[in-house]
C-alpha cells in the first residue's frame, strides 16, 4: 500500500474526526482525483510541440494523457475549432497517491525560491489549484531532452465541503503552505 494512503487511514482520518467532530468516518474528506493540465499554445504552428508535451506528461504521471482540443475558433490566435491545443491527465487511486507524494516531497522543494504554496488557491468547494511554471521540477524529466520549458496546472479535487477542511486535509498530507 502507498505511504500516503496508509498515513491517511492511520493518522489523518482520526485527526480530522477529532478536529471537525465528524459523527462517521465516512464524513472525513479525502482526495478524490488529481487533474494535471498543460496548454501547448505553440501546437497551432508546430505539431511536434504537442507530441513533446504528451510525452513529458506521460513520464511525469505514468499515464497516457488525453489531447484537449479547441472549443471555439479564435482568429487572433490563428486557432480553428477542434485543433489540438493541450493535454490533460486525470489520476485516481494508487497512481494519484504516488503522484501527490512525489509532488509534495520531491518536486515542490525543487522549485527555485520556494516559500510554500499559496493558501488562497482554494475554490470555495474544497478543491485546490496549483500552477507549476516549469516541468523540470519533476525528477523524471531529463533536462537535456527538454525542447521548451512548459508549465502546467495541477487541480487536487477533494470531497471536502469547505476550504478549511480541504486545507487541513492537504496540510496533514504534508502540503507546504505559506506561513
Curated annotation (Swiss-Prot):
Signal peptide: none
GO biological process, one term: translation
SUPFAM superfamilies (alphabetical): RL5-like
Entry keywords, A to Z: Ribonucleoprotein, Ribosomal protein, RNA-binding, rRNA-binding, tRNA-binding
MF terms (GO), sorted A to Z: RNA binding; rRNA binding; structural constituent of ribosome; tRNA binding
An example Gene Ontology CC term for this record: cytosolic large ribosomal subunit
InterPro entries in the cross-refs: Ribosomal_uL5 (IPR002132), Ribosomal_uL5_bac-type (IPR020930), Ribosomal_uL5_C (IPR031309), Ribosomal_uL5_CS (IPR020929), Ribosomal_uL5_dom_sf (IPR022803), Ribosomal_uL5_N (IPR031310)
Superkingdom of this protein's organism: Bacteria
UniProt similarity note: Belongs to the universal ribosomal protein uL5 family.
Summary of subunit composition and partner proteins: Part of the 50S ribosomal subunit; part of the 5S rRNA/L5/L18/L25 subcomplex. Contacts the 5S rRNA and the P site tRNA. Forms a bridge to the 30S subunit in the 70S ribosome.
Known function: This is one of the proteins that bind and probably mediate the attachment of the 5S RNA into the large ribosomal subunit, where it forms part of the central protuberance. In the 70S ribosome it contacts protein S13 of the 30S subunit (bridge B1b), connecting the 2 subunits; this bridge is implicated in subunit movement. Contacts the P site tRNA; the 5S rRNA and some of its associated proteins might help stabilize positioning of ribosome-bound tRNAs.
NCBIfam families hit by this protein: PRK00010.1
Protein name in the entry: Large ribosomal subunit protein uL5
Taxonomy of the source species: Bacteria, Bacillati, Bacillota, Bacilli, Bacillales
